[in-house]
């Protein structure tokens, strides 16, 4: 069994059947319990996620109904071969009883964490394999088919940061392995999606310069300077300005 949240939300049963989880408050509740696996999530937190500051008078009863529907859905589809209960009641709320390998988020976190450790140990190929495996679990934006309240929105932000962290580690591993050229398309994509991340801009500038594409590296700097000026009214960091001068002077650039 595997719950997959990193993209369109679905569950793969022990029998190998793929069960899409419909966009509903019951799915919203289940996803929050999965992300806080082995932790009792209070009814108040669940009500906040589902209705924010405007819960109905029947919120507690309706919450119990959603839990019932969730359990029935998982039971009807025989998600587990042993029919074990996955959503348990424990005051003051509920919790999801699943193993780490039964949730793609947990697997991704472990693989990226392992990749970072291997990178620190200079085991570059092993680090890259672990990071690739972790990042490949993303099939699109996390929780893309689930309505999200403010509690889940914070979880989405965490998952986006985790993905970015893993991608930066992978860039570092490839850089240290001398595989600079193939990183440029990914870096270009990253600076578009994270335009205020100066570290990514610096990596792109350095990669372009290393590949002999000095004009493009300088254009990348001008683009960063314009974005920072327009959005924040500041200049690039002194380190990036120094890199810019090194590129202008044809000196060796260190990133």
Swiss-Prot record:
Q: Which organism is it from?
A: Streptomyces coelicolor (strain ATCC BAA-471 / A3(2) / M145)
SMART domains according to UniProt:
BTAD (SM01043), Trans_reg_C (SM00862)
The entry sums up its family as follows: Belongs to the AfsR/DnrI/RedD regulatory family.
What does this gene product do? Transcriptional activator of actinorhodin biosynthetic genes.
Keyword Membrane present in the record's keywords: the answer is: no
Any idea which UniProt keywords this protein has?
A: Activator, Antibiotic biosynthesis, DNA-binding, Transcription, Transcription regulation, Two-component regulatory system
Pfam families attached to this UniProt entry: BTAD, Trans_reg_C
Lineage of the source organism?
Bacteria, Bacillati, Actinomycetota, Actinomycetes, Kitasatosporales
Known DNA-binding region: 1-98
Looking at the keywords, is Repeat present?
no
Q: Which GO terms describe its biological process?
A: antibiotic biosynthetic process; phosphorelay signal transduction system; regulation of DNA-templated transcription
What's the name of the protein? Probable actinorhodin operon activatory protein
The lineage's top-level taxon is: Bacteria
Molecular function (GO) terms for this protein are: DNA binding
């Amino acid at each position: 069994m595997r719950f997959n949240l990193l993209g369109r939300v679905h569950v793969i049963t022990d029998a190998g059947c793929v069960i899409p989880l419909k966009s509903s408050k019951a799915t919203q509740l289940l996803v929050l319990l999965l992300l806080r696996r082995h932790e009792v999530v209070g009814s108040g937190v669940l009500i906040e996620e589902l209705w924010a500051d405007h819960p109905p008078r029947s919120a507690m009863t309706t919450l119990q109904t959603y839990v019932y529907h969730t359990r029935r859905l998982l039971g009807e589809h025989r998600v587990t071969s042993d029919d074990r209960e996955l959503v348990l009641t424990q005051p003051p709320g509920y919790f999801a009883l699943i193993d780490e390998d039964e949730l793609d988020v947990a697997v991704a976190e472990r693989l990226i964490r392992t990749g970072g450790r291997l990178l620190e140990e200079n085991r570059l190929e092993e680090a890259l394999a672990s990071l690739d495996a972790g990042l490949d679990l993303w099939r699109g934006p996390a929780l893309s088919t689930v309505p999200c309240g403010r509690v889940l929105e914070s979880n989405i932000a965490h998952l986006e940061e985790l993905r970015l962290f893993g991608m930066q580690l992978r860039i570092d591993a490839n850089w240290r392995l001398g595989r600079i050229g193939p990183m440029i398309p990914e870096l270009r994509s990253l600076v578009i999606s994270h335009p205020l991340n100066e570290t990514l801009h610096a990596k792109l500038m350095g990669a372009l310069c290393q590949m002999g594409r000095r004009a493009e590296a300088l254009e990348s700097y001008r683009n960063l300077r314009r974005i920072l000026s327009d959005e924040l009214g500041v200049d690039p960091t002194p380190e990036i300005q120094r890199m810019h001068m090194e590129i202008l002077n044809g000196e060796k650039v260190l990133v």
